[in-house]
């Protein structure tokens, strides 16, 4: 583990700005969390422990959590199972106004496999990717269709909104998240212990999906 110190100079202090790979500590206790983020209570300076894990390490953790008979892991699996019911209730919901706007296109893509409500996980993922590639192609012109968040057209904020709704429609629990993103290229210019100033140009949004057994 390593540490990250955050000094909030001018951003809203209602929430804390928490590293994505937050390590175990007081901030992960239930009383410090809500469904939207981590409470800030007006604080503007704080230190976090963070965990840097590769994709392979994450898969090892997932396998351990799924197969281990350790009492602590068994307790975790029981708790996660209950939380998963909460996730499946709230994070698969799509507002009716969004369905009115996009359901025809979603169903058209799903029709190659059958009913949108009876897709395999792989088919659901493929349908979501096909739709998003039509809306936000890496090259060429996007298809002409009405999308949510028109005032933020072409931004990560619109992409994350559309992606979250699309994934949910195809049965994949998803949520919209936003914050500040520091790219690998930007971070490469700083040594350990150096201060990096993060401003509005780094403000981004992204979509997070729920992985059964491990979390967001």
Identify the residue ranges that each predicted region occupies.
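Helix-boundary/low-complexity linker signature
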Residues: 1-216
